[in-house]
């Protein structure tokens, strides 16, 4: 059985972001430069690029708080000047982060309404949309990236926030199926859809009934997806997830010179079980996803997932080699001091991928 071509895409050299304005179409869809050596080793970005986002990311130059507050006045209550004279929020305060997200989604991506229940995971928008920009590059494989309503994507574990499906449609016009094991999460995402006409008819929701399955029970016989995406549960237990969240809050407080303390808001993990942890953690979740992907090889062009722990890549490569996949790529992303990777694999040759994509986009 031939070995898959394992490729690692280096972090891309970044250009300045486009002007802030109506968000439906990214300001720049220029083709980025990539390096693809035939090894699985991680490539280091050049000095000075370590904290950069994707060139098409609207948040590459940080947050424009005056513009965000003008678009979403509720944010004003959480914005404070820093000792350096800039404006910011307390990122250890979940209510501040939630309002920042709502402001970003309204100002840059045209969402009239976005909200999450108390205790639900509140993701950073710049990092989430970065994943989508890299997926667009992956899909177009060096060709000019463009919006395409014919592209169908599957978001595994969408959570109560639904941001991958929301951003994927608003930025690239992709059509989404979003799945989750928690019915309350899906109810909240449906509420977001119902309050945003631009999302209606473009996002459909499916509940995963089996807590040990990923694609099984979600992908139907008539489905064809150009992309699947996922942010797997990171931790292996609720205790581990709670400790990780508290550690993050304490680090934020220490960075501001404050005495570390836990609040009731930061200790509320009730709605986050499926979002933050599962039995076996990220490693087991990825193993299940890879194993199940073989059964849906003819229905999905690219399978992808975030991988937070670098040590989990090696067993993934080994499992993919055993399945005989055609291509494996690893794309490194970095936001601030956090490094994560996109693992992508396809059972189809490059020629077949090109034919598939072109037929979908042309409507053939």
UniProtKB/Swiss-Prot annotation:
Region Disordered, annotated ranges: 1-52
Catalytic activity: adenosine(1618) in 23S rRNA + S-adenosyl-L-methionine = N(6)-methyladenosine(1618) in 23S rRNA + S-adenosyl-L-homocysteine + H(+)
SUPFAM superfamilies, per database record: S-adenosyl-L-methionine-dependent methyltransferases
Main localization of the protein described in the UniProt heading: cytoplasm
EC number(s) given by UniProt: 2.1.1.181
Keywords assigned: Cytoplasm, Methyltransferase, rRNA processing, S-adenosyl-L-methionine, Transferase
Source organism, top-level taxon: Bacteria
Gene Ontology molecular function terms on file: 23S rRNA (adenine(1618)-N(6))-methyltransferase activity
Subcellular location: Cytoplasm
Segments of skewed composition (Polar residues): 25-38
Pfam families: Methyltransf_10
Database matches in NCBIfam families: PRK11727.1
HAMAP family with a match to the protein in the record: 23SrRNA_methyltr_F
Protein name: Ribosomal RNA large subunit methyltransferase F
Organism listed in the record: Shewanella sp. (strain ANA-3)
Gene: rlmF
